[in-house]
């Protein structure tokens, strides 16, 4: 094998590792975000875990983050009368959860 081939294989391995870590971070972020949203809706325990799983499933759909944000905004409007969290605050929490996911997984940003 030439050094060029070695370098190419190394770059491919690095790319795959980065993709895997990004996937794990997004999945962890969605779980943390789902638990946060569940707590805002007054859910706890198994109900909160189930809600977090619903959001994780929504995130893997066609529209990804936008589907998650739309679901949360709709649920907040439908279930949490008087809850005053606007879209900007919700997106800020999503970013906080991503940072926490990176921290928990030991991923440098």
Regions found by a protein language model. Give the residues of each.
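A charge-rich, low-complexity, intrinsically flexible signal that marks solvent-exposed coils, linkers
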Residues: 1-109
């Amino acid at each position: 094998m030439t050094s060029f081939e070695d370098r190419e294989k190394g770059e491919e391995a690095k790319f795959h590792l980065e993709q895997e870590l990004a996937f794990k971070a997004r999945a962890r972020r969605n779980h943390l975000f789902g638990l946060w949203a569940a707590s805002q809706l007054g859910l706890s325990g198994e109900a909160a875990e189930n809600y977090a799983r619903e959001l994780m499933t929504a995130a893997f759909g066609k529209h990804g983050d936008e589907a998650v944000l739309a679901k949360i905004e709709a649920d907040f409007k439908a279930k949490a009368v008087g809850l005053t969290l606007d879209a900007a605050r919700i997106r800020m929490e999503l970013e906080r959860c991503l940072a926490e996911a990176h921290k928990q997984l030991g991923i440098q940003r």
